[in-house]
Amino acid sequence: MKKFIALLAALSISVSLSGQDDKVLFTGIDASMDCFLPLDRKVYPSFGLGARVRLGRPDQWVNLVSGVRYIHGKRLSGFQVPILVNVNLLRGKRFSGYLGGGFEFDFAGTYYGAMKYQAGLAGRHFDLRVFYKPYQGDLGTGFTFYF
């Protein structure tokens, strides 16, 4: 709990390097494509649509991302809820490059979720990322448009 409070404190006191407004809560729509790595020499693509919320701006050190999406494919179909922390290592006035990680809860049968790692580019109105979930052998890409 102390680490979580420290993370929120770091997010709230992060100093802005740009002239952006003070908005720190962004909501958006999300689209993704997952490509489950082959178990039997077949690739199983899945497609997802959902909504995301980002707490923090691209010019701050840390962003917290969550949301819900529905993924559909041959290997996995169901709702997923990611809770991720992104660290903006390459911060600019309008864009940032980040590394992130967290847990993605799944509501598909007896499977409950997996750790998720990602790297991407973020702007005020978008997030473009590549992610990997080692437990599932899931390599994918996603795009979020924030309003």
What residue spans do the PLM features occupy?
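A signal for specific C-terminal beta-sheet/loop modules enriched in small/flexible residues
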Residues: 9-10, 139-147
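Transmembrane beta-strand segments that form the barrel wall of outer-membrane beta-barrel proteins
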Residues: 27-39, 61-72, 96-107, 124-136
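Gram-negative (and chloroplast) outer-membrane scaffold detector with strong preference
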Residues: 48-109
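Structural signature of outer-membrane beta-barrel channels/translocons
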Residues: 52-58, 86-92, 120-126, 133, ...
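Short glycine/proline-enriched turn or capping motifs at secondary-structure junctions
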Residues: 3, 132-141
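Residues that define the transmembrane beta-barrel architecture of outer-membrane proteins
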Residues: 23-27, 41-49, 75-81, 95-97, ...
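Short glycine/proline- and aromatic-enriched beta-strand/turn motifs that initiate or cap beta-hairpins
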Residues: 19-57, 61-63, 144-146
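Cleavable N-terminal export/targeting peptides
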Residues: 1-26
